[in-house]
Design a protein with these regions (language model features):
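A contiguous loop/helix-start segment that scaffolds small-molecule binding in enzyme catalytic cores
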Residues: 261-264, 447-469
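Catalytic domains of riboflavin
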Residues: 1-3
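Hydrophobic helix-and-loop "lid/oligomerization" segment in the mid-to-C-terminal part
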Residues: 9-135, 155-156, 172-175, 183, ...
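Non-catalytic nucleic-acid-binding/docking modules located in mid-to-C-terminal regions
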Residues: 6
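Active-site cavity-forming subdomains of large catalytic enzyme subunits
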Residues: 126-205, 209-218, 228, 245
Length: 469
C-alpha cells in the first residue's frame, strides 16, 4: 500500500510570490525544497554560472593541478582511467579535452566491464608502466582503490584520484570511524571530511570539470573556455542520478540550454540518431534516451565506442557511430526485459520474495544489465535488491536500494563476503566467490531492521492544487 506524504512547511507564500513575481504555488514548491532565504530562492530560480562554487575549494585541486602542470611542462606521458558508465565516459571526455588544451601528452583507457571489472586495477597499472606512462589520473573511480594506488606508487608512477563516491571506512571497536584514503599524490573528492567544498553531491564529470577550471587558471587559459563541457557535465549529472538542487540545478539548466546548439559533433549525431533534433532537449532525454545509448556501449561492447563518438569530429563517421550505439541500446532493452522476467520467476519460485533484502541469482544474465534489473525489481517490490551474475572470476552483483536502507553501510558490515565492493546509499556494486552467496543473503537479512512501513511505496506530494489552477 502506498504512503502519501504531504509537505507542510510554512512560509508567507503570497509575499514570496510578490518578491519573485511567481505564483504562491511555485513559492510553496521552493519552500518544500528547504529553501529559506531570499538568496537561496533567487539562486534556485535564476542561478547562473557566476553562482557556482569556487573550484579551488576542492581539496587537493590546486595540488593536483600543480603536479599536472609540471608533468605537462616536462613532457611526461599522462593516462586517464575512468569508469565505463555515462559519468565515467563524460569525465574521461572532459579530462582528455581539457588536458589536451593545456598541451598534455595524454591518452585514455576505460576498463572492460567483463575483463577488468570496475575501476583501476593492477593489470591497468602494469600496462601503463609498460607503455611508459608517468602519471595516471582516475575519474569517477579510484577512491576505493587504496591497494591498487599503493601498487602504482611502488612502480614509480604518479597517481591522482578524482572521484565522487563515498570514502571507504572502518568502524573501530570504540565506535569511531577511520577512513581509508588511497595514497595518491592528490585525492580530489568533495566527500572527504576535510574538504571545504560546500556541496558534496556532484558527479564525477563535475569534479573533473572543476579540476580543469583550476588547471586552466594555472595555465592562464580563460576559464570560460571550460564552458564547452557543460552539456556533457549536465548529462552525467542527470544520468548518475545526482540531486537536482544547489549547483547541480544550475549546471543542468545551463547544459540543457547549450545542448540545443552543441558544437560537440558526436553529441549532435546522437541527438539526430534518436530523432530529437527538432525537440527541446530536457533532463528526460538525458536520462532515458541519450544517456542509455552511451551506457549501452559500456554494457555490451566497450565504453571506448561512446568516448570515441564524443571525441570524433567527422560528421559522417559520427553518424555511423551514433546509429550503432542507438541500435545497441535497443538490444540492451530487450535483454533487460528478459532479465526482469527471469528475476521475478526466481524470487517467486524460491520463496525469497518474502525476504527483507532481495538477493536474486541469475547466473546466465549478462553482468552489464544486473544494475538495471535490480532497479526494476526495487520498483516492483519496494525493497532493497541485489542482482548477482556468474562470471569467469566468480560472482558479480549490483544493488539498488530504498530510502530506509543505506546499502553501502550495510555492505560494509559484512565486507568479509566480498572480494571488492563500493557504492552509495542507494546503489552499489561488488564481486564475490560463489560459495559466499548464501552467507551474503543470510547476513544481509539477519542485519536488516526494515519494517513493513519501510516497504510501502512513498508518494511525496508538494501541494494540493486548487481546482482553478
Amino acid at each position: 500500500m502506498e504512503k502519501w506524504f504531504i509537505a507542510s512547511k510554512r512560509a508567507d507564500f503570497n509575499k514570496i510570490g510578490e518578491i519573485f513575481h511567481i505564483s504562491p504555488v511555485t513559492a510553496r514548491l521552493m519552500r518544500n525544497r528547504s529553501l529559506t532565504t531570499v538568496r537561496e530562492m533567487q539562486r534556485y530560480l535564476y542561478g547562473s554560472l557566476s553562482d557556482l562554487y569556487d573550484s579551488h575549494l576542492l581539496k587537493d585541486a590546486d595540488k593536483g593541478a600543480e603536479i599536472i602542470k609540471e608533468k605537462i611542462e616536462t613532457g611526461k606521458k599522462i593516462r586517464i582511467i575512468s569508469d565505463y558508465d555515462v559519468d565515467g565516459v563524460s569525465s574521461n571526455y572532459i579530462l582528455y579535452q581539457g588536458l589536451k588544451r593545456c598541451g598534455a601528452d595524454v591518452d585514455y583507457k576505460i576498463p572492460d566491464r567483463v575483463e577488468d571489472g570496475y575501476g583501476i586495477n593492477e593489470h591497468l597499472i602494469e600496462k601503463a608502466a609498460e607503455d611508459g606512462i608517468d602519471t595516471i589520473i582516475t575519474c569517477d573511480n579510484g577512491i576505493a582503490a587504496a591497494e591498487q594506488i599503493a601498487y602504482g606508487n611502488s612502480l614509480g608512477l604518479t597517481l591522482i584520484v578524482t572521484d565522487h563516491h563515498d570514502i571507504p571506512f572502518q568502524r573501530q571497536e570504540d565506535g569511531s570511524i577511520s577512513y581509508n584514503l588511497p595514497s595518491a599524490a592528490a585525492v580530489i573528492n568533495p566527500k572527504q571530511k576535510d574538504c571545504p567544498y560546500p556541496f558534496e553531491n556532484i558527479c564525477g564529470a563535475v569534479v573533473v570539470y572543476k579540476f580543469i577550471q583550476v588547471l586552466y587558471d594555472l595555465f592562464g587559459i580563460d576559464r570560460r573556455e571550460s564552458e564547452v563541457f557543460l552539456e556533457i557535465a549536465a548529462m552525467a549529472t542527470v544520468c548518475d542520478v545526482m540531486p537536482l538542487c544547489d549547483e547541480n540545478r544550475i549546471i543542468v539548466k545551463e547544459g540543457l540550454r547549450r545542448i540545443q546548439h552543441t558544437n560537440i559533433t558526436g553529441l549532435q549525431a546522437l541527438i539526430e540518431a534518436n530523432h530529437l533534433e527538432e525537440k527541446k532537449i530536457s533532463s528526460y532525454h538525458f536520462g532515458f534516451i541519450l544517456g542509455p545509448c552511451i551506457n549501452a556501449s559500456g554494457r555490451l561492447t566497450s565504453a571506448k565506442d561512446a568516448l570515441e563518438l564524443l571525441l570524433c569530429e567527422d560528421k559522417e563517421l559520427c553518424r555511423q557511430k551514433a546509429e550503432a550505439l542507438t541500435q545497441l541500446n535497443a538490444e540492451r532493452k530487450e535483454m533487460t526485459a528478459n532479465g526482469v522476467k527471469a528475476a521475478k520467476e526466481y524470487l517467486e519460485s524460491t520463496g525469497h520474495a518474502n525476504d527483507k533484502v532481495l538477493v536474486v541469482y541469475l547466473p546466465n544474465c549478462h553482468e552489464s544489465i544486473a544494475g538495471i534489473i535490480a532497479g526494476r525489481m526495487k520498483e516492483h517490490y519496494h525493497k532493497p535488491v541485489f542482482v548477482i551474475t556468474r562470471t569467469k572470476e566468480g560472482l558479480k552483483g549490483s544493488g539498488r536500494s530504498i530510502e530506509a536502507y543505506h546499502m553501502y553501510k550495510e555492505m560494509n558490515k559484512i565486507k568479509e563476503c566480498f572480494d571488492k565492493f563500493g557504492g552509495h546509499p542507494m546503489a552499489a556494486g561488488f564481486s564475490m566467490q560463489e560459495d559466499r552467496l548464501e552467507e551474503f543473503r543470510e547476513k544481509l537479512n539477519a542485519n536488516a531492521t526494515l519494517t513493513e512501513d519501510d516497504f510501502a511505496e512513498k508518494v511525496h506530494i508538494d501541494v494540493a492544487l486548487p481546482i482553478s489552477y
